[in-house]
Every structure is written in C-alpha cells, then in structure tokens.
C-alpha cells in the first residue's frame, strides 16, 4: 500500500512529460505551417520548444531544418546548423519535394558559413539542376542569385556573377536581381550598371517599397560617385525617382 503514492507521483510525472512532448511537437508543426509565410512566426514558435532533445528523431530533423530556414531568412550565421545535412537526406528518402529542393539552398549556405566554398557551389548546382527538372523557375532564380552573390563576394569573379545574374533575371525579373546585377557591373566598371540600378529603382517604385527605394538610391548614388565619378548624375536620378514615388503615394 505504501507504494501507491509513489506510483501515483510517477504516473503524474509521466503524464506531465508526455503532455510537454505533445505540446512541443504541436509547436513544431505550427512552425512548419508558417514556412514561406512569416519567418518571425516560425522563430517565435521554435523558441518555445525548451527540450528539442526530447522530440522524436523525425521531429528533431524538422526542428533542425526549421532553425536553418530561420537563420537563412534572417541572414544569420548557419555555422551550427549541421542538422540540415541529415534532414536533407531524410526529405529525399521521404520524397518531400518542397523541403528537398529548399534543402539545397540551406545546405549551400551552411557550407558557405563554414567557408567550404567548393561544397557550397556543388550544393547550389545540384539544387539548380533539380529546380530545372521540376520547372520551378522561382526557386531556380533564387539559387542562381545566391550563386552570383558568392561569385561577387567570395571569388570577386564579376564576369561569372554578371552571367549568372543575367540567367536569374531571365527566369524572374525582380527588383533585387536588377540591383545586384547593377552592383556586380559597377564593380566590373561596366557602363550598363546604370541601366540595372535604375531598373531596380523603377520596380521598387512600382511596388511602393519605400525601404528598397531608399536602399537602392543610396547605393546607386555611391556607385555613381565612386565608381563612375558622376555624383551629379546620381543626384538627378535620385530626385527623379523620389518624385515618381511621391506622385504614386498621393
């Protein structure tokens, strides 16, 4: 009879642990549903998971994948996101096309943060090949933009960067791609840089994205002043686009 209180306490503790595990698994799957919607929501849900080691093997892989996703989206270091490697293999096994495809980007950036640049490019090239096979032009453009970024800032190979950005723009002509192409061309002293910078600003104005407009104008002005020694031209362009933005806003 004396063992009954002990057994009752043990049962209560088991229930508490089980409930906690169920709650944390629930948080994990809620976070998964926010992917490609709101990265801040994914992060807010993940930080509530206090004991990821208590998750099942499958759930731990998802937890690692989601953390890598958050770090990628927030441009944070991914040097500790080693779980992305087994997670990627798992999603290949599960035939989860969406996660598998995105995993190539996450793996590539993981290798980038570890300064394993050859592995970084190999991962992104594999991802581009899969995206092409799946006819996912948006994801393919994303990966090519990443690859071009590394050509600019890791290898300083501006010609390859320009070629890669051009392919990405042909797939998906977004403001950020034109802006990055303009930067690469400016660094390469290419006169066509102005066209791409101005086109990026035009697209940002059309979208009404004030933060991008300011960012692009500031960088364009710096490029004109320091790379092409044309500060007056940069000022004129800045004024024209700011007036266009004000007109659209009113």
Give the ranges of each region predicted by the language model:
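N-terminal leader/linker segments that initiate helical-solenoid repeat arrays
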Residues: 19-69, 73, 78-81, 98
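Bacterial N-terminal signal peptides
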Residues: 8-15
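Tandem amphipathic alpha-helical repeat scaffolds
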Residues: 27-36, 64-75, 102-115, 139-154, ...
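Conserved small/polar residues in nucleotide/adenosyl-binding loops
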Residues: 240-247
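Residue position in alpha-helical solenoids
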Residues: 45, 52, 90-93, 130-133, ...
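Helix-turn-helix repeat elements of alpha-solenoid scaffolds
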Residues: 34-47, 74-86, 116-125, 155-164, ...
